[in-house]
């Protein structure tokens, strides 16, 4: 418990990164193995990550992100995508429950149909909202996992989502939820932590 408290207290949004700290796919995959355990509605795992290590592509993303330098100084840039059609994978995702005998065929069929109907009956706005909700849960898990591995991150919303889609050839079924830069923070330029509301200002008991 003390370790988690320390992790949360140490995690900051890094505005400046040190150069010369490349990150490998192996480093990132260790984090993604933990991210895979993030909660998602109906276990649909709506989130996809497009991870950019190539410096030339990062330069293009910098332009789409209003010229923010941390995009190119970071070790990698992640685009967190939410799949608006994730419910269509319900049959594949639940297949294992049937194979293991946890669900019989009738229960499996009902579970798939109930999930699909839940989304289709609520329309396109709900599908988009769900993509954003679930991808945001996953993104927070990634940032904590990164910090636990000794890396610093910054979640970003200041970018042109349509430009990002064009640069990375992202299909319209995905919502670009946020951009995350990751690297080693240049701590000497870090500002003090911003004001945080006391608990009684954001929690209500009834």
UniProtKB/Swiss-Prot annotation:
The lineage of its organism: Bacteria, Bacillati, Bacillota, Bacilli, Bacillales. This is Putative NAD(P)H nitroreductase MhqN. Its cofactor is FMN. Putative nitroreductase that may contribute to the degradation of aromatic compounds. Its EC number is 1.-.-.-. It is found in: Cytoplasm. Belongs to the nitroreductase family. Induction: Repressed by MhqR. Strongly induced by stress due to exposure to 2-methylhydroquinone (2-MHQ) and less strongly induced after diamide or catechol stress. Not induced by oxidative stress due to hydrogen peroxide or methylglyoxal. It holds the Pfam family Nitroreductase. It comes from Bacillus subtilis (strain 168). Homodimer.
